[in-house]
From Swiss-Prot:
It comes from Haloquadratum walsbyi (strain DSM 16790 / HBSQ001). NCBIfam families: hisF. This is Imidazole glycerol phosphate synthase subunit HisF. GO terms for biological process: L-histidine biosynthetic process. The gene is hisF. Gene3D superfamilies: Aldolase class I (3.20.20.70).
Length: 270
């Protein structure tokens, strides 16, 4: 059985002085300064993280290039796989980000706007380098294609872009199957509804995606405890659990999380 991965993630933006800084928020809003990206990456590397995710959260929205200098500094300090997302729009952007030290790139907005980018990237650099990120939001209307029962109500999940700021009308389950067909090596599923709440992952969303594809799925948003990771692994079938707040603020350590999962029979990397 494949081991499950524990992945801390930092959301990076420019502070008032134009310096890269880590921010944490709720539902993609109310962002608060959390720390320095390079220092936090070093700490997670030493803490036993299986991988590390660096997301430039405003590059796509404002049309700015990804912070490649900061990516390089992070890559120099860690010895675990590094995924970088935000502002990646072209084949050259993928190439530049990988050259800066990333092992994988996470693409959201550009892939939805130009799906051929997935095919091109996978062909040029290998599917293992191409992670398709999906910022999903629940919609309780009649415009979707695949409906799920969530808390007694029928809803569908819409792909959003520009850091969750804009809807697309595209059904998440339709999109992930297309992304897989085009060569995506992993799917990074963010729930805007669960983001930062620490109330648990969006199990209906994650489970539906895992059922729809065979590509590895990284569950993101809402983790508040090791029990939430246990649930998303055992109930939804996720291959990896991403978390931010619970690790950033020291509520739980990666070591304690792995011990909790191991004691309950979840295969993890030691």
């Amino acid at each position: 059985m494949l081991t499950k991965r524990i992945i801390p993630c930092i959301d990076v933006d420019l502070d008032e002085d134009g310096n890269p800084a880590v921010y944490t928020g709720i539902n993609f809003e109310d962002l608060e300064y959390t720390g320095d990206p390079v220092e936090m990456a070093k700490q997670y590397n030493m803490a036993g993280a299986d991988e590390f995710v660096f997301l430039d959260i405003t590059a796509s929205a404002v049309g700015r290039e990804t912070m490649l200098e900061t990516v390089s500094r992070v890559a120099d300090e860690i010895f675990i796989p590094l995924t970088v997302g935000g502002g990646i729009r072209t084949r050259d952007d993928i190439k530049s980000t990988l050259r800066a030290g990333a092992d994988k790139v996470s693409i959201n907005t550009a892939a939805l706007e130009t799906p051929e980018l997935i095919t091109t990237g996978a062909s040029a650099f290998g599917s293992q380098c191409i992670v398709i990120s999906v910022d999903a939001r629940r919609r309780f209307d009649e415009q979707g294609e695949n409906y799920l029962s969530v808390d007694g109500e029928s809803c569908w999940f819409e792909c959003t872009v520009k850091g969750g700021r804009e809807g697309t009308g595209i059904d998440v389950l339709e999109w992930v199957t297309e992304a897989e067909t085009r060569g995506a090596g992993e799917l990074f599923i963010n729930s805007i509804d669960a983001d930062g709440t620490q109330d648990g992952y969006d199990i209906p969303l994650t489970s539906a995606v895992c059922d729809a594809v065979s590509t590895p799925v990284i569950a993101s948003s809402g983790c508040g405890s090791p029990a939430d990771m246990h649930e998303v692994f055992t109930e939804a079938g996720a291959d990896a659990g991403l978390a931010a707040s619970i690790f950033h603020f020291g509520e739980y350590s990666i070591e304690a999380t792995k011990e909790y999962l191991d004691e309950r029979g979840v295969p993890i990397r030691t």
